[in-house]
UniProtKB/Swiss-Prot annotation:
The encoding gene: rps10
GO terms for biological process, alphabetical: translation
UniProt keyword Ribosomal protein, yes or no: yes
Protein name: Small ribosomal subunit protein uS10
Domain of life: Archaea
Keyword Ubl conjugation: no
Organism: Haloquadratum walsbyi (strain DSM 16790 / HBSQ001)
Similarity section: Belongs to the universal ribosomal protein uS10 family.
SMART domains, alphabetized: Ribosomal_S10
Record's GO cellular component terms: small ribosomal subunit
Subunit (UniProt): Part of the 30S ribosomal subunit.
Amino acid sequence: MQQARVRLAGTSPDDLDDICDDVRDIADTTGVNLSGPIPLPTKTLEIPTRKSPDGEGTATWEHWEMRVHKRLIDIDADERALRQLMRIQVPNDVSIEIVLED
């Protein structure tokens, strides 16, 4: 049977956990096997910028960072489960990637 690998990525870990709970509920209602959610390492994107707009004065820096959290879920590729999976309401800051594998 085919497996569907669902990759979730977003800046809010609470939103990711809510979507993982929705996927788990879908797997329970349709009776398909589920493994995960597997938390992947968090990627930290950091951008240092100068505080002063011109080049004068002391070199003081601000550091802006954004953390990207990721989750991985493997689910059996049942047609009913995948149809319900496509209907999940996803927030704007969360991206979902579904790949079918043998």
